[in-house]
Amino acid sequence: MKLDAPFNLDPNVKVRTRFAPSPTGYLHVGGARTALYSWLYAKHNNGEFVLRIEDTDLERSTPEATAAIIEGMEWLNLPWEHGPYYQTKRFDRYNQVIDEMIEQGLAYRCYCTKEHLEELRHTQEQNKEKPRYDRHCLHDHNHSPDEPHVVRFKNPTEGSVVFDDAVRGRIEISNSELDDLIIRRTDGSPTYNFCVVVDDWDMGITHVVRGEDHINNTPRQINILKAIGAPIPTYAHVSMINGDDGQKLSKRHGAVSVMQYRDDGYLPEALINYLVRLGWGHGDQEIFSREEMINYFELDHVSKSASAFNTEKLQWLNQHYIRELPPEYVAKHLEWHYKDQSIDTSNGPALTDIVSMLAERCKTLKEMASSSRYFFEEFETFDEAAAKKHFKGNAAEALAKVKEKLTALSSWNLHSIHEAIEQTAAELEVGMGKVGMPLRVAVTGSGQSPSMDVTLVGIGRDRVLVRIQRAIDFIHAQNA
């Protein structure tokens, strides 16, 4: 049987991996980790990475899901050398191989009705036998190929399938446990397990990194590969990701979609760093640059045990990257969140300044955008608890005094603003907090912000003075 090689593959590449999601939903964190491990292994070995969309499930696959998967891969910055390839565009190739297999006696047409198969299964269950096809049609030549039928792979009946999993070690499955797998449906469409085999062959895949839920497919796929004379890739089945309660990760544990983490304010570097450590390690190191991941990653260091997703750890990593990455880079991601929250940033400080001001305070970019709205827009009301706590006593007098000094400043900068607040406190013979806290509530609407000099510079003189007067009027109205 001949290899179909339309992909312009470099024959000198020794390692070629793939990520092959089904477009029936978003890119979830488990799939993203599998893609990351596959990508890292290729990069570590100077190999190539293939993106393949396994869209043979015509009822459940959608263009929207495909777009979401590609968007997630691009956001995570996991570029591919080949693809995306779509299985639905390769049906002719799959059917060509199936027809050749029938000719060579490696597969056969099965005309059994649904009723016959159900009766067979019922009988086997009654006899406490393993449900499997009885090869009724293997030697039945009384039907025309034009009659409705499926095509089954003629699986070996003796011996075992043995493979050395790069994560789990040697795995052996007796062929007596395997059925004659359907490789083409009645409607003429090839099945998932068969398409995967032909694709891995044609695309020169040397290493298959995928979830442990695919282990049962592997012996079936290996037998087909052997039958058609194709090389057998190395398989690596990675463990599942659980929630912190030990149950399989699902929506009830929080976000599971990669793009939901983007929406929630996480940087791709944080999610990548978190996912790589979720089942793999290099000593006690927690924080890895992309280059370090590529240099250190090996499949035999991937854990066999399930990993527990810990959102607090992810938040810690996210805050680290918000602090440590260049403000210009973080600002590009922050800009998306301002747009998402309908905050117009055209009249206010540079976003790089926002990042510098709030990097130590915010765990997510979503929080950074929402908590800095006052730099760009007017707020409607003062935070009730903050106003009750700080708009009392001599707060109005302190605000009037500091407004007077701020108005008189010839230069609006950190030093001059700090001096104005300090002088106001000295003249009123009160602590800095008695001036600073009412001022903070007055100009931000809340009791939390960066230092007052930084905050006032960011808001701008005109807005600051208007807001202070608004707060004074509010206090007088409350006391009237």
UniProtKB/Swiss-Prot annotation:
User: Where is the motif 'KMSKS' region annotated in this sequence?
Assistant: 248-252
Q: What is its EC number?
A: 6.1.1.17
- Record-level Gene Ontology MF annotations: ATP binding; glutamate-tRNA ligase activity; tRNA binding; zinc ion binding
Q: Which GO terms describe its biological process?
A: glutamyl-tRNA aminoacylation
Q: List ligand-binding residues for ATP.
A: K251
> What cofactors does this protein use?
Zn(2+)
Chain location of the short sequence motif 'HIGH' region per the record = 21-31
Output the PROSITE patterns linked to this UniProt entry.
AA_TRNA_LIGASE_I
Q: Which residues bind Zn(2+)?
A: C110, C112, C137, H139
Pfam families, from UniProt?
Answer: Anticodon_2, tRNA-synt_1c
Q: Which UniProt keywords apply?
A: Aminoacyl-tRNA synthetase, ATP-binding, Cytoplasm, Ligase, Metal-binding, Nucleotide-binding, Protein biosynthesis, Zinc
Which HAMAP family does this entry report, sorted A to Z? Glu_tRNA_synth_type1
As for family, the record states:
Belongs to the class-I aminoacyl-tRNA synthetase family. Glutamate--tRNA ligase type 1 subfamily.
What job does this protein perform?
Catalyzes the attachment of glutamate to tRNA(Glu) in a two-step reaction: glutamate is first activated by ATP to form Glu-AMP and then transferred to the acceptor end of tRNA(Glu).
Protein known as: Glutamate--tRNA ligase
Q: Which organism is it from?
A: Haemophilus influenzae (strain 86-028NP)
Q: What is the lineage of its organism?
A: Bacteria, Pseudomonadati, Pseudomonadota, Gammaproteobacteria, Pasteurellales
- Gene name as annotated: gltX
